[in-house]
Amino acid sequence: MSDTENTNLTPAPAAEKTLGMRKNGKQWHAPKKAFRPTSGLKSYEKRSQERAIMIQVKAKEKEMKEEKEEERQRKVQAIKEKRAKKEEKERYEKMAEKMHKKRVERLKRKEKRNKLINS
């Protein structure tokens, strides 16, 4: 009797959960596991650090875009000024063909005064 008591007292090895036959008959497929999204795995500190880094990156990108746009606007303005100067020169040359040289000079001075007053 003591032999049977000793066998009953020893704990059985941990019962492994054995998977039986699959109900749908597709035994060649790997068994499915519970869906665990990765969104909950990051800590709050890590997410806040990533947000801070993203804010810095966005600010740097915005600054670079503004610099690029400013450079483009400066080039456009220079081209416009150059064209305006060229048009004005051509206009004075046309006037010089028709009028006396001194009169054209007087008109130039008069127009420059008007530009300064109007602007």
Swiss-Prot record:
Superkingdom of the organism of origin: Eukaryota
Keywords: Coiled coil, Nucleus, Ribosome biogenesis, rRNA processing
Region ranges (Disordered): 1-46, 60-119
Compartments reported by the entry: Nucleus, Nucleolus
Residue ranges crossing the lipid bilayer per the database entry: none
Pfam families (UniProt xref): Cgr1
Biased composition (Basic residues): 23-35, 99-119
Gene Ontology cellular component list: nucleolus
Coiled-coil segments: 49-106
GO biological process, alphabetically ordered: rRNA processing
Disulfide bridge positions per record: none
Composition-biased stretches (Basic and acidic residues): 60-98
Composition bias, Polar residues: 1-10
The keyword Repeat is assigned to this record: no
Family: Belongs to the CGR1 family.
Its biological purpose: Involved in nucleolar integrity and required for processing of the pre-rRNA for the 60S ribosome subunit.
Protein name: rRNA-processing protein CGR1
Species: Gibberella zeae (strain ATCC MYA-4620 / CBS 123657 / FGSC 9075 / NRRL 31084 / PH-1)
Higher taxonomy: Eukaryota, Fungi, Dikarya, Ascomycota, Pezizomycotina
Originating gene: CGR1
